[in-house]
Amino acid sequence: MDLDIIVQNKKNKILVIGPSSSGKSTVMHAWITKGLANKKEICFAYQYNIIKKYTTRIFHYNLLKCYEDNNSSDINTDKLLEKILTIKPLFVYILFTNEEELENRISKRRYNEYEFFNEKKPYKREKRLEISRNCNYIELYKSLIQLLEKKEINYSILDSTNPKFTKITYDKIY
């Protein structure tokens, strides 16, 4: 993965953002396995207000949180993301998975971030499926990319539909 290059520079702050089951934890776990990051450097978005004063450099953000909290596919309504985007320097990895594959993953998933918490916290499949089915993914990705460009934040889009995490451009999404 050429995305390892950004992670190798320990000064970089990194946001990995994508819908539930898009592969955020898979990417981060690969970095840990390669020795490019450790678990203490990772902050799940919901923890941000609690641990922001600590040296955290990799942020795990569920893109569906915006829809879940605000019933909107407009990322500009997401106050927590707005706070995280003020971190400098920040590089963003946007994970894109086609909706059919995403729904398949969500329907089969049993646990919530097991590789990070080492406990079998049940994954709320039905709730996630409902959110996923109601969300306008194209609008969500579009508003995220427009926001990043407006704020002049560097980003890469990775197609996580298959395990190779291929780099793509936004025209493959919308």
Where are these regions (language model features)?
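Hydrophobic anchor at the beta1->P-loop junction of P-loop NTPases
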Residues: 16
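Extreme N-terminal, non-catalytic leader segments
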Residues: 1-13
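Short secondary-structure capping micro-motifs at structural edges
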Residues: 74-84
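The conserved Walker
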Residues: 20
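NTP-dependent small-molecule kinase module
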Residues: 2-5, 135-174
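A glycine- and Lys/Arg-enriched "phosphate-lid" helix/loop adjacent to the NTP-binding pocket
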Residues: 85-144
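Walker A/P-loop
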Residues: 25
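Conserved substrate/cofactor phosphate-moiety recognition/catalytic segment
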Residues: 28-73
